[in-house]
């Protein structure tokens, strides 16, 4: 049990921030989750952006990509890294590079970078650094972009402090998913009210 390897998706950090108990019910207890209209719309928007990107994309190597001083962009970059008995998986919505830095961008229909969203993007930054550590010679920036209007909601240089905060969150989530730690349910009844598990969750505050 102590050496159990746990798979964690980068997007799970946002879910855990919403409610660890909900994530536990879905990922460990495997209770079915019905896709909402918002989830379906999000998938369609991402697919549309990817298809638009493919039409104009020019092949290049990762070495050329990270050395570029002109703005270059890739989309739907899938990465994984194994450490601390965790297989971390992630798909970066948009990865860009210019002379000043590398930009790890997530598209969401949000106008505020909640901590769960930031941890998700830091997960992508962590994956990027561990997959391309020999190629990255520029600062890495975490970016949240509004999916609908394209405006940048949040942009911040990825630092050692962010990495430390992310790693602590990853180890906590590892212990929740391996059932070494009890998940913490939300204390916000508004979250319970919109949760698909509110009829079966013993901690639900929905009335």
Predicted segments, located by residue:
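Short small-residue beta-strand/loop micro-motif enriched in glycine and branched aliphatics
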Residues: 102-106, 151-153
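Short, charged, amphipathic alpha-helix that recurs within catalytic cores of restriction-modification
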Residues: 117-130
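Acidic active-site catalytic centers that drive phospho-/nucleotidyl reactions
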Residues: 93, 106, 120
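Metal-dependent nuclease catalytic regions and adjoining charged, substrate-binding loops involved
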Residues: 70-87, 111-112, 130-207
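Structural signature of nuclease core domains in nucleic-acid processing machines
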Residues: 98, 107-108
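A short secondary-structure junction signal
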Residues: 106, 116-117, 205-207
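Metal-dependent nuclease catalytic cores that hydrolyze phosphodiester bonds in DNA/RNA
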Residues: 1-102, 207
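Short, surface-exposed beta-strand-loop junctions and turns on beta-sheet-rich folds
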Residues: 31-32, 110-113
């Amino acid at each position: 049990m102590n050496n159990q390897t746990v798979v964690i998706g980068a997007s799970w950090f946002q879910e855990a921030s919403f409610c660890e108990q909900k994530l536990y019910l879905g990922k460990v207890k495997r209770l079915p989750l019905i896709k909402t209209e918002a989830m379906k719309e999000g998938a369609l928007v991402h697919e549309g952006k990817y298809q638009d990107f493919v039409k104009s994309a020019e092949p290049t190597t990762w070495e050329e990509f990270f050395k570029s001083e002109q703005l270059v962009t890739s989309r739907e970059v899938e990465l994984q890294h194994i450490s601390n008995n965790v297989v971390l998986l992630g798909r970066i919505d948009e990865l860009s590079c210019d002379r000043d830095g590398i930009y790890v961008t997530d598209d969401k229909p949000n106008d505020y970078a909640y901590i769960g969203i930031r941890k998700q993007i830091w997960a992508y930054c962590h994956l990027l650094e561990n997959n391309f550590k020999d190629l990255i010679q520029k600062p890495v920036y975490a970016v949240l972009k509004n999916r609908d209007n394209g405006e940048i909601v949040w942009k911040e240089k990825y630092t050692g402090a962010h990495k430390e905060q992310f790693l602590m969150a990853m180890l906590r989530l590892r212990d929740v998913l391996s059932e070494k730690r009890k998940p913490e349910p939300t204390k916000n009844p508004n979250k319970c009210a919109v949760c698909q598990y509110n009829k079966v969750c013993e901690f639900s505050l929905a009335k």
